[in-house]
Amino acid sequence: EAVETIIGNVNVKQPVIYKEEKQDKIELILPKKSSNSERAKTYLMSRGIAPEIIKECMDNKLIYESLPNHNVVFIGLDDSKSPKYAFYRGTNQTRFMGEAKGSDKKYTFRLEAKTECSRLHLFESAIDLLSYATLLKLKKIDWHKENMISLAGVYQPSKMVESNKIPIAIQEFLKKNPNINEIYLHLDKCKLCNAKSFRKKL
């Protein structure tokens, strides 16, 4: 269905664009979990994420701290709540980050609405997503009522916008949620004209 509204922040950017290649499925290999998540919590709080949101994500097994490097790991779950995707990010100043081997991009890190919702918010990273949830909380808006998906890093789109492909995470979500009629792009450094092409493809 056509998307009625596409809104970004000050700038709007087309989401992750990549050409999916058929390949044998590899089982997801999750980083070893630390028994203590204090470094991960401290890092996320230093990024301005609300402690309550961090705790809820950790309680729901969406975020944990890994060993031996104490990275923050963001988990994407399938419909049966099984881990299918993992993105790790260093808790120091090195900006170390990457995807765990076997990650399925259909299930990137997300927070789904707990009630009926026709809106979908797209973010470049899990940190951006959590920051937005925190802003909603600060405004006393219930972030549990919004669908939010991280695109796990934005790939450089083709110069020929019409040839770009919608990220599989969005395709899958829209397939399972046909009621979505508004998509909000919270992405960086983009030309507004690209949003028009993106809208047509949905």
What is the predicted role of each segment?
Residues 7-10:
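Non-catalytic accessory segments adjacent to catalytic cores
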Residues 122, 181-193:
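Acidic beta-strand-to-loop metal/phosphate-binding motif
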Residues 173, 194-202:
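Short, aromatic/basic amphipathic alpha-helical patches
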